[in-house]
Amino acid sequence: MPIKIPNTLVEELVRLGMLVMKDAKLYENLARKEDKELGQILIEKDVVSANDLLEIKSRLYHLPIVRVEEIQLNSDILKEISEEVVDFYKVAPFKKEGNVLKVAILNPEDVDALEALKFIASDKSLKIEKHVIDYRDFEAVQRNYRSLTEEVGKALELLSEEAG
């Protein structure tokens, strides 16, 4: 999937004086070349700190922040969004309260990710509550998601062997 450049975020960083448009274009090209999110590039190049970027995203998109230490993945959450969707769209469910699914999202401007969440919500009769998350925390959630998916898979294998 091609990297989606968050134009509203770029404009906000320029407005705040943290980035000049000429450099923004260079970083956008680098993000595409390295197949990384623009925010990751900006953090790696010390344009903005991870924490400042997260705070700016939260304020800009009017979304709460979620941190990895607040996330307790369990097998029920895995049923809501597949690992493939998590990896492809950079969204991760982290809590379900009634019919509200709380989801961490890296790029709230990614229309494809938002459409995927809308589809999932409609398909499962859920409401989606989006939260922004930083890159390091998202990677930790992905790792936990992967290991939990593997554990559930192994448990299902054992059950089918015992039943068979």
Predicted features and spans:
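N-terminal, intrinsically disordered, highly charged
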Residues: 2-164
